[in-house]
Amino acid sequence: MQRMIQQFAAEYTSKNSSTQDPSQPNSTKNQSLPKASPVTTSPTAATTQNPVLSKLLMADQDSPLDLTVRKSQSEPSEQDGVLDLSTKKSPCAGSTSLSHSPGCSSTQGNGRPGRPSQYRPDGLRSGDGVPPRSLQDGTREGFGHSTSLKVPLARSLQISEELLSRNQLSTAASLGPSGLQNHGQHLILSREASWAKPHYEFNLSRMKFRGNGALSNISDLPFLAENSAFPKMALQAKQDGKKDVSHSSPVDLKIPQVRGMDLSWESRTGDQYSYSSLVMGSQTESALSKKLRAILPKQSRKSMLDAGPDSWGSDAEQSTSGQPYPTSDQEGDPGSKQPRKKRGRYRQYNSEILEEAISVVMSGKMSVSKAQSIYGIPHSTLEYKVKERLGTLKNPPKKKMKLMRSEGPDVSVKIELDPQGEAAQSANESKNE
């Protein structure tokens, strides 16, 4: 490493016709402006005596003069980052020929020292010299602040040397010294191909640190360069997480949509009718028959009628309202006033149960809250129906008021709700009261 720095320092001092210290090349890598400036300065003695003063003079030069000198001495392919990318992907024949001749001079024809890729003494120049330049160009394209991204040239050479030593150790352990000599060109091509992929992936990974400042210290560059598969591992981990989520998705069931209404009706009405059987002193057969009448459709009711007529008879005898349940289902009737399927927690009742609850409350046998707990009808609904039939509503509906004026108030409303003739009997009871 020291020999490489001394070689670069010797070429730099021979270009400027001065004897500077070998620690002088610790300037930035993109030294096109500072390199050309000492050519135009006349007091070279002050620069040779004081390196700090030489740096100040190099920084205070006139920029238009530096631009003209740089255009006359440099090639556009060496300064333009876009052209440099094209040169990296397809190295010219001259660079490959120089890689096999370490004794050849590393300066170009115009006297300006070349890139750090030309200072590889062991022939592996093109594969190891590309990364610092490519990384610097990639970060300049990604961030836009090229002045803060200039890597020190000595640091870039050190990084290249570390990468070279690690690659040599890994290849020497697998191939041996003879294999290392025979497969030199293959290592160059493979190393350059491996650097072509981390060039873009490394830029994507370094975009996260934009707010913290851009790459002033890149001591972690060899680690990130060798572990170029880190973004791929992160993407693979994300894909594995998505696969795990997709495999575990059948566990997340939509329970409210799957939940059946009849099951909740059975669990709730079982308690309600068992409580009613205890209060009214009825048998368990009557509670079971009430539940079956409320839940089962027409066909199953007919089969139950054929199977057990005794239970239905006992239920008819011990009915609280004195009115037997009809065998027809309210939802199955074509002339029903409620064609829509009932929804909600408290709408698991039909018009038959509602009529029975209304008649019981109007006859004074039960209160509204007691009928709510027994029949499963909401308190507000039951109270509204009772007040509507008694004519004690504060704001009665207009349509039903017209019907009340034309016909009897209770008879007309109950004929609308229950067209099977049972409403007339309950209406007569309410009139007598």
UniProtKB/Swiss-Prot annotation:
Which cysteines pair up through disulfides? They are none
Which residue windows does the record flag with biased composition (Low complexity)? 36-48
User: What processes in GO biological process is this protein linked to?
Assistant: cellular response to estradiol stimulus; negative regulation of transcription by RNA polymerase II; regulation of transcription by RNA polymerase II
Q: Which domain of life is it from?
A: Eukaryota
- Per the annotation, the residue ranges of the short sequence motif Nuclear localization signal are 339-345
Q: Which stretch carries the motif Interaction with nuclear receptors?
A: 53-57
Residue spans binding DNA: 368-388
Protein location = Nucleus
What keywords sit in the KW lines? Answer: Activator, DNA-binding, Isopeptide bond, Methylation, Nucleus, Phosphoprotein, Repressor, Transcription, Transcription regulation, Ubl conjugation
Q: Which InterPro entries match?
A: Homeodomain-like_sf, HTH_Psq
Tissues where the protein occurs: Ubiquitous.
The name under which this protein is listed is Ligand-dependent corepressor
